[in-house]
A protein has these predicted regions:
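Short, flexible beta-strand-to-coil junctions
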Residues: 35-41, 74-77, 140-148
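Short, surface-exposed beta-strand/loop "edge" segments at domain boundaries and coil↔beta transitions
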Residues: 37-46, 77-82, 109-117
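Pocket-edge structural micro-motifs
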Residues: 35-37, 70-73, 104, 167
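Short conserved beta-strand and strand-loop elements enriched in small hydrophobics
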Residues: 64-83, 137
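A short linear-motif detector with a strong N-terminal bias
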Residues: 7-13, 48-50, 80-84, 115-120, ...
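Catalytic zinc-binding patch centered on the HExxH motif and its immediate surroundings
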Residues: 88
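Polar/acidic, low-complexity leader/linker segments enriched in S/T/G and N/D
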Residues: 1-68
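Residue microenvironments linked to proteolytic maturation
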Residues: 28, 66, 91-168
């Protein structure tokens, strides 16, 4: 895939999915995901330069440490995170070559944990993952772009907000 994603068939996620299919809602739903890549165009034609994406990833690590790394289901236009739409928390990020990887914890409700009742965005995402749906991950941020041929290069004023779950 050319964009970030969470794949239920990824070997890193197989043990998580096996546990979740046993319907033990007491355990958190945690997954590994490709969050973003530098130096290659994504599906919307944007290219993130290495220097800019690494700078923003380092800044985002501070948000993770403070518990401020929430993200939403779907990808709103707003630069603000809407707590009614929060679906997951990024708990760790790291580099694998030019790929920014992450560990996500879906924020599910007590009703989902106790009875499988879907009532929050995190519940929806958890239920989709349990059913084997591959979801996309899209970085949300603000900043300018510069046209370079067919691609839009993200500029130095870019500020990363979060990594939303989207349809792939």
């Amino acid at each position: 895939m050319d964009a970030g994603y969470i794949s239920p068939s990824d070997p890193l996620n197989e043990s998580f999915l096996k546990e979740q299919k046993q319907m033990d809602y007491r355990n958190p739903f945690e997954f590994y995901a490709v969050l973003q890549k530098f130096g290659v165009p994504n599906r919307n034609g944007r290219v993130y330069p290495e220097k800019i994406l690494k700078r923003e990833a380092d800044r985002y690590k501070t948000a993770i440490k403070k518990g401020l790394s929430t993200s939403e289901l779907n990808h709103p236009e707003s630069s603000l995170i809407d707590l009614d739409r929060v679906a997951h928390l990024i708990t760790d990020i790291w580099w694998d070559g030019h790929i920014l990887m992450g560990k996500l914890k879906l924020l599910t409700s007590p009703g989902f944990h106790e009875s499988g009742i879907v009532s929050t965005k995190g519940d929806i995402a958890a239920n989709l993952m349990r059913q084997g749906v591959t979801m996309g991950v899209s970085s949300r941020g603000v900043g300018s772009l510069a046209k370079k041929g067919e691609q839009n290069e993200v500029q130095d004023d870019f500020e990363l907000i979060c990594f939303d779950l989207v349809s792939s």
